[in-house]
C-alpha cells in the first residue's frame, strides 16, 4: 500500500522468540536511537526472521525506505508488550485500524498454525485500499478461521461502536483488542464501556510510531 514498507530482519542467536502482538525496539541509526515496531510475523526458530510493517507517519518512518539497505546490520531489542490475546472470553473482537493491523497479522499466522476454540471477528478500517494487501489479509484470516470485516473510508463509512455491535450481536461475551490511532481506540473504549462492557475486557496497544 502507499507509504507502507515491509522489512525482514534475520536475527543472530540471542532472540528467545516472541508472541503475536509484541513489539521490538530497532536501531538502524545510532544517532537517532531505537524506535518501536510491532512484529508482523509468527516466530519460527528455524529461520529466525522478524517481519516489520511500517507506514510513513512521521520523520523517522518517512525516511526508512531510503535509509534501509539489503544486508545492513540493525540492533533489535525485545520482545516487549503484553498485547498477547490471552483471556478467558469465548469470543474476541479485533480492531486493527490502518497500520494497526500489524499485530493481528502475526496473530492470524500463529492461530493458523495453532488453532484454538475462540470465535473471532477482525475489523480493519483503512483509508487506503491495495488489492494485493487485502487479498493476503483475507487469505490469512480464512486460514486462521477468523471473520474479516473490511471498511474502506469513503466507501463503507467510518467504523464505530454501533457498527461493531450490529455486526457482532454477541459482543458482550467478547474481549476487545485494539491497535491504531489512540484517539480512535479511546472513543471505542468509552462507547463500549458506556454500553456495559467491563473496562478490563478492552485491550489497547499504546505505543505510537514516529
What is the predicted function of each stretch?
Residues 1-75, 92, 112, 118, ...:
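Ferredoxin-reductase
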Residues 77-88:
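A short, basic/flexible loop-to-alpha-helix module at the beginning of a structural domain
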Residues 46, 59-61, 66, 72, ...:
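Reductase modules of NAD(P)H-dependent flavoproteins
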Residues 63, 84, 103-106, 187-188:
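Phosphate- and divalent-cation-binding pockets in alpha/beta enzyme and binding domains
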Residues 91-95, 177:
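Conserved beta-strand elements of the Class I
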Residues 21, 100, 181:
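Short, conserved phosphate/pyrophosphate- and ester-handling motifs at nucleotide-, phospho-/glycolipid
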Residues 101-113:
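Histidine-anchored nucleotide/phosphate-binding helix
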